[in-house]
Every structure is written in structure tokens, then in C-alpha cells.
């Protein structure tokens, strides 16, 4: 049960209640004078409850509150398959949907006069985040910003001015101001990049779609070398977290990898960065497609991405794969559960056995190890160690505070027991899950580059 949201007159409150298995959410109305409560909304998901603006079963609270009339409650739900705003009239006991479409609503702010919501949304393209105003009475949504990229907005107290943190694909975040009006114009305030940074022509990767083997559209970032400089080899990057978006039109959270991808392209490689199944921004079905099988549909999207690269003229026998955290896990599953698909892979800070990872994360997707052992077994790389064929590089910080170092130690021991020879482990003694030292990042990516250059270029020319 999450914290109560009180009406201004203090006579009633609402809160959301979650089942322990995270498959049900109830929003309840509490009469504070009688102590009685009634159900406003019930959401059930055979996989797990989630999505933008929707609370977790832990302390993470979602969108929930009152309009100024002390009668109308607002909340978000994935009822239609995408997270949208809903309103409930507590007097008339009536619920209606305010926003709709195949896009997601984020970061709701109620206007002072309680007549509008300000939201962030990817309505124009899954890879954009624009700032919109939703007129509650008219049920009309207008763009305040509309440019490709990400507009992270804070309203001034009088709601007349916007402070905007904006970026696009090859431009880091900068601060702008704008008037709060439809299709506003931004005024740039900061110029944060250095001469050294600006001296390099950072690429704007194309955001492309290709068809998965189930005919669903898969979004990805595509980095391509100039015609004539391509070496017909490619690298697939797997972002971390699972529920995260990286095939978008703004500056990546993976800025180091973005720079590394530019280096790869400088040397003739093509790079594909896929928003695989379970990535953020694409609705409920996309989010839950990995239920009971991590390394299933999400890994298949990378195999389909490899086929897409082949359609662009890439040699399908010269495609490597790498990623960190969840991306490292997918890399391990690619190398171990689909042997022969990739000649090489680099797995950074990877989970090797989900039964040893934190319960809060895994219980949503795989249920519990004691009640659903099959889901854990088919989703854990350590059970496929005997299948290793390609060259595998594993890299892990010894003081990892997220994916414990024991994960990579156990898989290493399993490789030793199986007499596997085509693997290496690079240990970083002072690093946790997110590396801090520049020399560690350099060492890590030097090793990864050398792996791809050796396995995809040198060996192909012998």
C-alpha cells in the first residue's frame, strides 16, 4: 500500500494497493469520516504491473492525485496497452480515459487552475520526448514543443515560462528557456561542450525499424561508415537494464558507448543498437514480452537484427555482439544458447544466474525460483555453458554492488570444468557496477575493440 493522497477538504483520500506478486493494482477511495473504502480501478496483468507513471510494489509511487474540485481523481493505467491518463468522478462513480494512442505519457504535472495537465510524451515518434498540454474539459492535447529530441521541462511558478533541458542524437544536454505557448521557440542559455569535443564530427545515427521474426517493428540506431570505407563487419550493442530506451533521437545515457560506436565506424564497422523486446517506450506488450524467459524474445530480436544487417550487405559471419549488465546477460545468452550465431562477444558485468540476482527485479519477470524453477533455468546463461563456441570476453568489477562478482566467478569455474579454452576474464579490482575511473573505461573498451578487430577483421583476411 502506497501513501495516501488527500483531497483538499481532508474528508477523503486515495491510494494504490499492490499484490505481493505485482500482478494486481487497486486504486481505492477512502472515506476518512467513516473509514470505509471503495475500489476506483483494478488493473490485472498476467505478467506484471508496470509502465510509465505506474507505481511499483516497492516505494516507487506512480501518478495519483486530485483535481481542485475535490471530486475528481486522476491516475495512469496501461489498460489499452499504453500508459495513459484516466480520470474518475468519485460522486458519479464514473471513469474515463483522457489521453489515448500508441504512445506513452510521462511526468504529469497538474496546472495551478486544475484545468490542464502538462506531460512529457513520445506521441510524434517513440524516440522523441516532447512537452504537451492536455486540456481536461476539451480532452485536447497540444504540443508546446515539437522538435525531434528530448525536451525535459520545468515550469516556472507562474506557469508562463519553461526551463528546458534539451538534447538531440549528437548534441549533449543544454539549457534553454521558452514561453509557455503552443509550438514554442527555445532560446539557448548554455554552451557546454569544449573545443576538443566540437572538433570531432559526431555522427547522427539513423533510427531505423526492421521486422522481427514475429512481424513486429523493432526500432534501432544504425551507425554506418561512408560508402567505400565499410569493412562488411558489424557490431551489435545491447543496452542494459532491460526496461530502458536507447534507439531514440536524443543524447544517449550510454554516451561512452556512443563515442565507442563512432570509433568503430571510423574503422569501417557498422553498428546496430537495438531497442529489443522489454525496452521502454513501446507499450505493455513490448514491455512484458520477456515474461518467464529472459534471453528468449529479446535475444531473438538481436538475431533478427543480424539478419537485417545482412540485408544491408554485412557479412553475417562477421557480426559481433556486446553489452553491459542486462546487455552483458544477453551477450552471454547469444554466445551460449545460440552457439555459432556470433563469432565473438564481450559481456560486461553480466548476470549469469538469475536465482542469485535481487528478488525485486527478477520476481516480476521470472516469478520465484522455488515456484517457477523452469523460468530461471532457461533464462540463466550458466546452464548453457557447455555450448560455448565463439570467442568470449567477460569483464567485471570485483566490488560490483549490483551484479555480484560471484556471477562471473561461477561461470568461469564452469568453463574450466568443461575444458573450454576460447574465453577470457578481465577483472577490475576497484570498480563497482558503474565504472568510475577513466583508465578502467579505457582498458575495458581497448579489450573490446581488440576482440572485434581480431575476430571480425584479422581472422577473416587469413
Task: Identify the role of each PLM range.
Residues 1-9, 16:
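A conserved hydrophobic secondary-structure block that centers on an alpha-helix together
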Amino acid at each position: 500500500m502506497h501513501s495516501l493522497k488527500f483531497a483538499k477538504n481532508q474528508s477523503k483520500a486515495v491510494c494504490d494497493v499492490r499484490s505481493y506478486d505485482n500482478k494486481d493494482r487497486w486504486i481505492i477511495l477512502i472515506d476518512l469520516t467513516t473509514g470505509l473504502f471503495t475500489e476506483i480501478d483494478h488493473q490485472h496483468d498476467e505478467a506484471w504491473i508496470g509502465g510509465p507513471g505506474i507505481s511499483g510494489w516497492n516505494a516507487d509511487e506512480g501518478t495519483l492525485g486530485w483535481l481542485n474540485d475535490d471530486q475528481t481523481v486522476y491516475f495512469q493505467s496501461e489498460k489499452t496497452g499504453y500508459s495513459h491518463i484516466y480520470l474518475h468522478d468519485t460522486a458519479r462513480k464514473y471513469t474515463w480515459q483522457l489521453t489515448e494512442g500508441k504512445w506513452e505519457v510521462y511526468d504529469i504535472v497538474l496546472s495551478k487552475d486544475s484545468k490542464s495537465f502538462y506531460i512529457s510524451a513520445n506521441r510524434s515518434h517513440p524516440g522523441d520526448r516532447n512537452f504537451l498540454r492536455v486540456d481536461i474539459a476539451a480532452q485536447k492535447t497540444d504540443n508546446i514543443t515539437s522538435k525531434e529530441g528530448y525536451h525535459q521541462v520545468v515550469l516556472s511558478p507562474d506557469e508562463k515560462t519553461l526551463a528546458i533541458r534539451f538534447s538531440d542524437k549528437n548534441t549533449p544536454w543544454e539549457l534553454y528557456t521558452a514561453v509557455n505557448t503552443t509550438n514554442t521557440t527555445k532560446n539557448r542559455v548554455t554552451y557546454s561542450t569544449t573545443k576538443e569535443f566540437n572538433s570531432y564530427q559526431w555522427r547522427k545515427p539513423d533510427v531505423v525499424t526492421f521486422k522481427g521474426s514475429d512481424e513486429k517493428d523493432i526500432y534501432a540506431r544504425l551507425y554506418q561508415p561512408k560508402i567505400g570505407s565499410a569493412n562488411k563487419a558489424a557490431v551489435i550493442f545491447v543496452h542494459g537494464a532491460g526496461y530502458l530506451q536507447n534507439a531514440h533521437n536524443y543524447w544517449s545515457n550510454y554516451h561512452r558507448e556512443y563515442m565507442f560506436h563512432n570509433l568503430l565506424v571510423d574503422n569501417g564497422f557498422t553498428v546496430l543498437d537495438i531497442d529489443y523486446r522489454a525496452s521502454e517506450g513501446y507499450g505493455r506488450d513490448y514491455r512484458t514480452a520477456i515474461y518467464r524467459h529472459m534471453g528468449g524474445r529479446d535475444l531473438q530480436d538481436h538475431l533478427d537484427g543480424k539478419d537485417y544487417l545482412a540485408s544491408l550487405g554485412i557479412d553475417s559471419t562477421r557480426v559481433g555482439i556486446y553489452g553491459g549488465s542486462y546487455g552483458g546477460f544477453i551477450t552471454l545468452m547469444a554466445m551460449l544458447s545460440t552457439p555459432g550465431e556470433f563469432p565473438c562477444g564481450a559481456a560486461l558485468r553480466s548476470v549469469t544466474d538469475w536465482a542469485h540476482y535481487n528478488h525485486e527485479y527478477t520476481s516480476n519477470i521470472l516469478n520465484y525460483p522455488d515456484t517457477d524453477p523452469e523460468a530461471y533455468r532457461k533464462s540463466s546463461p550458466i546452464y548453457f555453458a557447455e555450448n560455448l563456441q565463439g570467442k568470449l570476453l567477460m569483464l567485471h568489477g570485483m566490488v560490483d554492488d549490483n551484479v555480484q562478482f560471484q556471477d562471473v566467478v561461477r561461470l568461469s569455474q564452469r568453463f574450466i570444468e568443461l575444458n573450454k579454452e576460447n574465453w577470457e576474464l578481465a577483472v577490475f579490482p576497484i570498480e563497482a557496477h558503474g565504472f568510475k575511473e577513466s583508465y578502467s573505461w579505457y582498458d575495458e573498451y581497448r579489450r573490446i575493440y581488440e576482440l572485434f578487430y581480431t575476430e571480425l577483421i584479422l581472422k577473416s583476411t587469413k
